[in-house]
C-alpha cells in the first residue's frame, strides 16, 4: 500500500536506463525517480551524461535499454512523442527559437499546432508569460533582434506557455555572456516557487544551493551521489564528488 502511495506522487521514473551512441555507452544503468513538483538539479563534469540523461527522461532520445515512466505510463517507441508533448517542455542551451517567426509566434506555435489551443487563448497566455519574464514589449519583434539573455527568457516563456507539468533546462546559461546569466537565473528562481516540476542541468552552483530540493551528481554515465543541497555541498560522501566540488567551488 505504501509503495502504491509513493508511486502516485512520482512524475518521472527511470529503471536501469542505458543509452549508447554506436559503441559509446553514455548512460550506464541509471535509476532515478522525480516526484511531482520537485526541483531537481543535475551536475557533473563535461561528458558525464547529464544532457543525455534529461533527453532520455523527456523522450527526445530513445533509451537503448531500460524503462522510462512518465506519470506511470511506460515510454515506448510509439508513445514517447505523445508523452513528450503532453508532459514536457524544454529550455535548450542555444535557445532554439525560430528566427523567421516573431516572439509571439514562437510562443504560440506549439500550443496551437500540437495541443489545438485556440489562437486567441494561446496569445493571451503567451502575453502573460512574456510579462512574467519582463519582455511583453518584445512580443512582435524577431528573436535575432534580442540579446542572448532576452532570447533565453523568451525560451522560458515559451516553455511556460505549453502548460506542461515538467520543464527541463539543459545548461540554460552556458551560451550566455557572463553579464546576462543572472537575468535568466532570476527568472528560474522565481519560477521555482510554482508547482511545476523542474529538472535542471547546470554548472551554476549558487542556483543549485538556492533552488534545488535535491542535487544529483553524474560522472562517467553513472549517478554517483545525490542528496539535499545542504548535505551535498557541505558533506559529500563520494571521493569523486569531493574532487569535483573542490575544483568548481574555488
Q: Which role does the model predict for each range below?
A:
Residues 2-9:
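Short, Lys/Arg-enriched N-terminal segments with co-localized hydrophobic residues
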Residues 9-11, 250:
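Absolute protein N-terminus
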Residues 11-229:
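ABC family nucleotide-binding domain
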